């Protein structure tokens, strides 16, 4: 090139710039959002009434517990009206969108309770629900089954089957829970089912030998993700795995990230006495990835750098 002539930089095509931006954006989404999980919880809230939740210390703790979960299944809600749940939703709504779905009051005596789903309505929606038709009256509180959407292409929906057993009939009710699974999986053609709640499946209510003979233990495909021996009770004097989560279906297994109890007294620095005002149970929870376990974050970082160098 003759000296003295101006040198103009080569113009990068718009399509090239757009492609580079798309690659970077896609990888950043995977890198930042890949670890985001969807949390499903179950909590025996121990005779939950409006009188109980309007106590400030109880309400604050309950709201913090509920706010951790994308779907929470509450048990032992004994309020015949909707006031208790509406009060909790009012406190939750300050930062996020929530809705709820509840069963009727259930029970054989004057004592009755209901199942209540509280869920993030900006992240999931109810597709279907029904009260299991317990024609033989096996359950004291028959499951209130619901199907929810999930933010996952691998598993677009999941079925939740909550159960709070009565201690004297634990084995009978848990074996009948297998029939509920068959009913719902055939009804909605969906075998990705999570059974969860206060099963009373330990200690004096169910000996280990009887536990291992349950249909949900002997039939293939069921995974008890809260391990035996995990204490789900608040009192220091007890050590029982009453509360459980049982998962079925390949989609659930592919997306499973973690399952655990939530020790809310330790997290919120409560004494045992303070915690017992909320409940004598810990919540149990399962986390589902939005995509199947794939590229680890450190590999995504490397892939991002390589892509930038190739496009640069």
From Swiss-Prot:
Classification via SMART domains: DNaseIc (SM00476)
Signal peptide: 1-35
Gene3D superfamilies recorded: Endonuclease/exonuclease/phosphatase
Pfam families in the cross-refs: Exo_endo_phos
Gene Ontology CC, one term: endoplasmic reticulum
Keyword NAD set for record: no
Keywords: Disulfide bond, Endonuclease, Endoplasmic reticulum, Glycoprotein, Hydrolase, Nuclease, Signal
Record's subcellular location: Endoplasmic reticulum
Annotated active site: 113, 164
Keyword Endoplasmic reticulum attached: yes
Glycosylation, residue list: 102, 133, 239
Covalent S-S links between cysteines: 203-240
EC number(s) on file: 3.1.21.-
GO molecular function: deoxyribonuclease I activity; DNA binding
Main localization, broad class: endoplasmic reticulum
Similarity comment: family membership: Belongs to the DNase I family.
Protein name: Deoxyribonuclease-1-like 1
Taxonomic source organism: Rattus norvegicus
